Amino acid sequence: MIAILSNLMNAKRWAHASPSFLQFDLGDPAASGRGACVRAIEEAAAYVARGHRDIITELTGLTFSEVIFTGGAGRGRLWPQIMADVLGVPVHIPAVTESSALGAAICAGAGAGVYSDLLELRPGLRRRTATFEPDQAATAAYDEQYAAWREIYRRMLEITDDGLLNPLWRAAGA
């Protein structure tokens, strides 16, 4: 099953196709039930993350050797593994998963002079509760699925542009 939800950011043309689950099979509840839908959503989010990573690499030349997955998404086991497999790099779950709140507190502490600078706290922030290593066979399969997802999304946008489907969202002027 393939979920079509969010698209990659594109400042020249930012639009999202009509949300869809493709290859949904009413005759096979195991392949199209709740678990399959959740997995398809998590895979679609991982494809968007991969696309954004690729854009950053293309623009800056920087590559990523690891990813840190924070927040509620890091509490499960499936989504971090999907991310590791789609991105092809280890995904780490930090001990403190609420990184936004922690970052704000650290910046406030540095601003108030509690810490000499932000780097002072770096060693304590590297504690991790789990690491998900990419499975090479899964990564190879996801490479093919990602290419298919990109092409399907491109065609879904064409259908949307032709007025056959309503977009999920379209930026003003797009």
Where in the sequence are the language-model features?
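Low-complexity, flexible helical/coil segments
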Residues: C37-I41, G103-A108, R127-T131
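Acidic, glycine/GT-rich loop-and beta-edge segments that sit at the periphery of enzyme/chaperone cores
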Residues: G113-A174
